[in-house]
């Protein structure tokens, strides 16, 4: 088909009628013959509408127009809405922008819905906007939107759809065609490849055209889903599509000549996968857990279950409806719960939930797609476990109306009775935990009730001692409640109160001394045998008529005695306030009172005696010694006095000098400073240095007053300009003469000399110790001499041979070749010598220790000192001796011999060397 005069060749698109949607019109043959339509069904003229728009759309701009077919009623009573607030639909079906819109991608999608006012029917159509590469003006949009309807009408009759053509110059442009999307149902069974569209260019009459497609599903992963016949332009799908994997494909068709030159501009193809109901609803969890309070009213929210269908939620395939299939147990009704078919919210529908009867319900929930159509939809099930939560709708009740208990008097923390209760609420919760309260019968708070957390019993215990003599029976009234308040409308039961009768058992109580907050007041100085007080105790067991006996527990000064029968306390010594056992004028003693009960009981009492001071102590003078200059220079000695008595028996004091001997008042004088201080000074102009005893009389202010004569040892000494005693004066004052001082100095010198001599002697002794030789003189050392002891053992008698040849042979061959098992022990071993540990040095060893140490050191360092500590062999002379046989020696030979080598044998052979080597010198 060609365009009008002056138009360029058209790029054509043919849709195959077999792959259109449920609402798509089948395309006729390529020759343009129209197909017949079926009966009228209300709805949109198409399942989807498309339009080309610019990236930026102004507010109020018209994009396209949807057509709704209302059959006989037309479009009256129909109103439209969109799911995108950026767009709105007019009453005539025109789609506008509600605000300025900027499309971020190359396309935008939204849904237009049509509602009927009279019926709840709803119809939907998909709108898809494609962004063109070159923006169009307002008139072009209008042309495009108007041409869509005629384009759709042409598509119904099988007319080819010419695509937009571009012209050069100012020539009038042909109307643009909106290319509708291709709808392909998922899960198609083929056969494959299956043709979708036919793409043709009218230039193929003159040139050889090659067609190709690009995009996801063609040359991009997933690849090879779609292909195109490069010669004829037939685009096919090669395998079944799955909408849940990908819901749409956007391809671009290209037309080039055999040289690869572009013949037509590429066109965009949108392929939408039509959803099929091939997925069951899937619950988010196989088991849902919820709870609801017992006694809840109908309509109370319980829980929400959710299921998801992978199919298109905009179609019935993905719309899930819920229903309850089963409830277990079916008590008190088989319909205790209801579920909202669309939201999955479960509510109570009947009253009568009681946890004490049914604690848990199991509800089977079914989710069905196709809007709950059980005949055509797919279903799945899940389990909802609904727990009936406990509320405090059962008050606790005592198992008995009266409880009995008993308790011994004067005991605490004793269990009196266990109060048992029952509560049908859930155990170990605040609705079950019991709280007990004594509402009467215990005004003084002698009893408390604690709750056993395991048994929920009330344990009545004694918190304050009870007295049998005061009260023999306690009639208690106890009430029990829960930690949580009762539910609304629930009243307390008559069984929530009970009586508890507590009997008190009499026991032998200890006697007690009445509290004496105030001490008894007594004058100190009370003589022995005086009665102070009758310190009697009280026996609380009046009915027992028991006898009390008294004894003393504590009497620090041993001043008191108590009568064992009547408790009279008397003195055994004079009371003295100044005693160290008296603290703050109080003397404390403790006494014990014991009854004759079985077993006997005893109580203690403390007696406080406040001693009133009397003037029984004379003052004491201070200081006891002092020093003063031999010549008066205005200074003196400050004296004072102390009196252990208190005022008015203490200060002010009177200080005076005695009249006898007369020299006291002649040499000394006293001047009063204040009530407790006075100054003692010289009366004369000079007093010889020395020690003087100055008596001073001190009198207190008691009635009668007491006085005391005290001696002050005064040291009179010569003083310097500062009034301080000089050293000479101090020595003289000490009473030491010149001879005594010289004697002391001589003694000091002698002592120092002795110390010096002792040190010198010790150093000399230490030096001798280090240089000391062996006590045995070397001349008398015969260890290396060969002596004859007239032994009958073997061996040579001739001893005039060279011992060094035996002890130090020139070679070791005879040692190495000696017979096994025979060893010389009178010579130093050839091998490595054992190293002995060094003995620790004693700081000052004795003579014997020094001698032993030096001898050991000399023996250890002597290489030729036999014997070693081993078995001695005397009959073995070794092998390979350089001297040959000893018998070959001729000591009487007259031939001249050279004995100079004897001098090389060391000091031990010095005598032998002198005998032979020094003969010529003699």
From Swiss-Prot:
Q: What is known of its domains?
A: Three calcium ions are usually bound at the interface of each cadherin domain and rigidify the connections, imparting a strong curvature to the full-length ectodomain.
Name the gene that codes for it: cdh4
* Keyword Nuclease annotated: no
Q: Which Pfam families match?
A: CADH_Y-type_LIR, Cadherin, Cadherin_pro
According to its UniProt entry, the protein's GO biological process terms are: adherens junction organization; calcium-dependent cell-cell adhesion via plasma membrane cell adhesion molecules; cell migration; cell morphogenesis; cell-cell adhesion mediated by cadherin; cell-cell junction assembly; homophilic cell adhesion via plasma membrane adhesion molecules
Residue ranges that the UniProt entry lists as topological domain Extracellular: 25-740
Q: Where in the cell is it found?
A: Cell membrane
Q: In which tissues is it expressed?
A: Expressed strongly in ovary, testis, brain, eye and kidney, and weakly in stomach and intestine.
InterPro entries attached here?
Answer: Cadherin, Cadherin-like_dom, Cadherin-like_sf, Cadherin_CS, Cadherin_pro_dom, Cadherin_Y-type_LIR, Catenin-bd_sf
| Compositional bias of kind Low complexity | 138-159
Q: Which residues lie on this side of the membrane: Cytoplasmic?
A: 762-922
Q: Please give the PANTHER family that the UniProt record associates with this protein.
A: CADHERIN-23, CADHERIN-4
Q: Which domain of life is it from?
A: Eukaryota
Q: What is this protein called?
A: Cadherin-4
What Gene Ontology cellular component terms go with this record? adherens junction; catenin complex
User: Which residues belong to any copy of the Cadherin domain?
Assistant: 176-283, 284-398, 399-513, 514-621, 620-728
Q: Where are the transmembrane segments?
A: 741-761
Membrane topology, record value: Single-pass type I membrane protein
Q: Where is this region: Disordered?
A: 138-162
